[in-house]
Amino acid sequence: MSVSLSSCSSPSVKNPLLLCADSLMETYPDSALSILESITYPQKMPRADRALYALLLTQARHKNYIALEDDSLIKTAVDYYGDKKKSLRAAKAHYYWGATYSEMGYTSFAVEEYLTAIRLMPVRDEFLAMIYDNLAECYERDELFDIAIGAYRQAYQILRGGSQQIYPLRGIARMCLLQNKKDSALVYYQQALDCALVEQDSSLIGALYHDLAMAYSEKKDYIQADKYVSKAIMIQGQDAVNVCLSKAQIMLNLNKLDSASYFYSKNVDQLDIYGKAVYYDGMYQIAKKRGEWKTATENIDAYKILYDSIQFITDNEELNRLMDKHQLEEHKRLLSEHTKMLIS
């Protein structure tokens, strides 16, 4: 999804480097970033130029997958463009403020800024759809699946009929699956797959085959699940860690123990703590079915250790979520004080 700022470039911005970076942003974000980073003493620019510089630099970093570690830069753009009058730049400023908060783990504040960005959008286009998509991800993160699916549907209504509709369709399908609406999930995943096949997007095709395998597994239709996970492996290869774990679990459910053992062990050195927990639990199930009690005990003991670690991580994440609102209010207060100091 791509929207250029150049279509609404302010006549007050004359800096040729800013205008050049703006024109390159969607097609060559790495070049845009290089240009922006070459600008010396941006603080000496006129206020309009500083605001555009802050917006473009945040955008370029985000597009180049550079972490947005604080909001001091984008706040310059937010303060300049405001939140009263509809404009693409104002919407973009609040969107990237939301993206910054999202990366910092402040989901509640990210939602607030995404909603502001939606309100400020002057047109219904791909950028608005992207805001809805990111808003949906925040709701999904907080397990507000009913609200998340509404945001995904808004994105889909904008993108319907185009190649980008794959993303909200996949989001809708995932929300249906999380709400135990398995048949609806299958319908939306199939729609997304049909679109990906038309576009011949191999990475999305492989991902959607995997999605369908998981949906059929939830329905306990392991024959269909195996059909789709095998297709995913054909596209993504046996180095695809999560796909191989899914294949192993499906093989276990089909009681094909040798195949299950092979796929559980395929990429064991690459597994994170969650993957290793799945691995040890699966190997325990296999050993138990074979009557190999010593091996079963070793695997279940390893699984329990990992489970305790995962539970500790989960408890901390829940604590962070409970603290989130308090932290954000404090952060907002400090920002307000900082702004007052700059004005006075």
Predicted regions and their residues:
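N-terminal leader/linker segments that initiate helical-solenoid repeat arrays
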Residues: 8-71, 75, 88
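Structural signature of alpha-solenoid helical repeat junctions
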Residues: 12, 47-52, 69, 89, ...
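"A position-specific structural signal for the A-helix of alpha-solenoid helical repeats
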Residues: 19, 56, 89, 96, ...
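Amphipathic alpha-helical segments of tetratricopeptide repeats
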Residues: 37-42, 75-82, 115-120, 153-157, ...
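Hydrophobic positions within repeat-based interaction scaffolds
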Residues: 13-26, 30-33, 41, 68-71, ...
